């Protein structure tokens, strides 16, 4: 008896296309930029520390606001928050491309992280809402496969553009892709939200943002100052205690941002584990000589 064929509806196909393109923005931008860093550094006269913050300013805001972005999507509408994130990401990409100083680029990259925090969790949550149990695994598999391919393609593109002195084009490419995703999402993909999300878990949002920001900042600055530095230890301790408090709050909150029972679902845990591996791979790609010491 042959395996049952999974056919996607028209809405599901457009949803898959939109989320793949949106994720491609983030993956290509991250991996292509890594290869173009030497050209960028030479053009803008960026110091080693500033170069680190071009990358890590993005990572700090992305990691700190990631769960908040997902929670806002459940509460106010996944498409709405996704598109707001897409708008922030594309506008900040334009600002990155026209930056004339290291400070301008670092600030624009930080706003890219804010946009990515609204955009990234939206991709998977929109997929999960539009695909049933039978087709969800296949859809997430396709999403992750194409995301991996774009992560591989990114360095090739970045090296080619950097070689021609066109590193700014890496950021400008996000604009037409964002327009395509924006139109497709509005016209073809219906809005969805979590019907059980009644209000924002404010304490959870504050604790998880503080926790992730503290941990991320501590690890970002540890190569420069060392783990024995008081600021680094304080940052890591505050971040760690905040995340522990976040878990406790989620256990007893009436409106938890991240219900702990979700981890009993193999689909949820597997999807998040897959995302972790993909972004861990990107984190490895983003290491540069300055970071490696």
Residue ranges and their predicted role:
Residues 14-24, 28, 33-35, 48, ...:
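12-transmembrane solute porter fold
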Residues 175-194, 209-221, 238-253:
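C-terminal membrane-cytosol helix-exit motif in multi-pass small-molecule transporters
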Residues 73-74, 78-80, 136-137, 194-200, ...:
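Interfacial helix-loop-helix linkers and transmembrane-helix boundary segments
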Residues 102, 166, 191-198, 222-228:
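Membrane-interface helix caps and helix-loop-helix hairpins in membrane proteins
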Residues 2-187:
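Transmembrane-helix bundle of Major Facilitator Superfamily
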Residues 4-12, 97, 197-199, 225, ...:
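Helix-boundary and loop/linker segments of multi-pass membrane transporters
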Residues 84, 136-149, 197-207, 232, ...:
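Cytoplasmic-side transmembrane-helix entry/capping segments in multi-pass membrane proteins
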Residues 126, 160, 188, 249, ...:
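A residue-level signal for alpha-helical anchor/packing sites in multi-pass solute transporters
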């Amino acid at each position: 008896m042959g395996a049952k064929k999974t056919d996607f509806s028209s809405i599901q196909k457009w949803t898959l296309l939109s989320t793949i393109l949106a994720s491609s923005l983030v993956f290509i931008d991250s991996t292509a930029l890594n290869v173009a860093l030497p050209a960028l550094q030479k053009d803008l006269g960026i110091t080693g520390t500033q170069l680190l913050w071009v990358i890590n300013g993005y990572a700090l805001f992305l990691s700190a606001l990631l769960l908040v972005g997902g929670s806002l999507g459940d509460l106010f509408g996944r498409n709405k928050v996704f598109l707001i994130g897409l708008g922030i990401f594309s506008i900040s990409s334009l600002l990155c491309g026209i930056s004339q100083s290291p400070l301008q680029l670092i600030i624009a990259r930080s706003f890219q992280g804010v946009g990515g925090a609204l955009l990234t969790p939206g991709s998977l949550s929109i997929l999960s809402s539009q695909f049933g149990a039978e087709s969800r695994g296949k859809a997430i598999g396709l999403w992750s496969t194409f995301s991996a391919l774009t992560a591989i393609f990114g360095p090739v593109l970045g090296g080619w553009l950097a070689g021609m002195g066109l590193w700014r084009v890496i950021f400008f490419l996000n604009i037409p892709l964002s327009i395509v995703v924006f139109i497709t999402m509005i016209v073809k993909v219906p809005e969805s939200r979590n019907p059980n999300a009644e209000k924002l878990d404010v304490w959870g949002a504050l604790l998880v943002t503080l926790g992730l920001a503290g941990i991320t900042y501590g690890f970002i600055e540890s190569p420069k100052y060392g783990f024995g530095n008081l600021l680094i230890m304080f940052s890591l301790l505050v971040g760690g205690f905040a995340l522990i408090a976040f878990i406790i709050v989620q256990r007893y909150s009436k409106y938890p941002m991240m219900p702990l029972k979700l981890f009993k679902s193999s689909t949820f845990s597997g999807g998040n584990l897959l995302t972790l591996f993909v972004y861990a791979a990107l984190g490895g790609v983003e290491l540069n000589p300055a970071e490696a010491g």
